[in-house]
């Protein structure tokens, strides 16, 4: 399936996932993993015992001198905040985009993921690793889960 490389279209899709901390992120993780696979990456969903997951996508030859880009898929709750529009619908007002997570951190996820099809993935001489975690907003729980299972699932990563 060919997906739209437009980062704004992907951001709209990502913002629509209500990935409030402590809630499942499996749907957004599946979209991001699929995009990475379509771009030539080897992906893994690293699931935790509470039904959460992290996404790991690797491109290029395995190495310890490549680069890791890391981000999180969860957002802070919207309860008690004065939103003038649905926080889980991306809207444009006066040339700016508004939606929960558009700046922290779904905008970054959309930008990186949308750029993947334009990268010369098969020409990489060093590894590029994308790590998208869950529950960063509430104590970096996804990162802790990743660290606990690092050697078992990831092996050496770029330093």
Predicted regions and their residues:
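Acidic/His- and Gly-rich active-site-bordering loop/insert found
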Residues: 1-102, 118-125
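Acidic/histidine-rich catalytic neighborhood of metal-dependent amide-processing enzymes
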Residues: 105-159
């Amino acid at each position: 399936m060919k997906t739209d490389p437009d980062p704004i279209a992907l951001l709209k899709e990502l913002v629509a996932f209500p990935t409030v901390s402590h809630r499942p992120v499996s749907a957004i993780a599946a979209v991001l993993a699929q995009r990475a696979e379509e771009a030539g990456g080897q992906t893994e969903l690293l699931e935790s015992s509470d039904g959460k997951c992290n996404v790991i996508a690797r491109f290029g030859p395995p190495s310890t001198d490549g680069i890791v880009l890391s981000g999180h898929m969860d957002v802070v709750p919207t309860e008690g905040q004065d939103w003038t529009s649905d926080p889980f619908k991306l809207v444009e007002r006066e040339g700016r985009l508004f939606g929960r997570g558009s700046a922290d951190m779904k905008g970054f996820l959309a930008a990186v993921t949308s750029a993947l099809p334009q990268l010369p993935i098969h020409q990489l001489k060093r590894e590029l690793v994308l790590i998208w975690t869950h529950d960063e907003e509430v104590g970096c729980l996804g990162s802790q889960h990743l660290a606990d299972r690092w050697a078992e699932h990831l092996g050496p990563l770029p330093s």
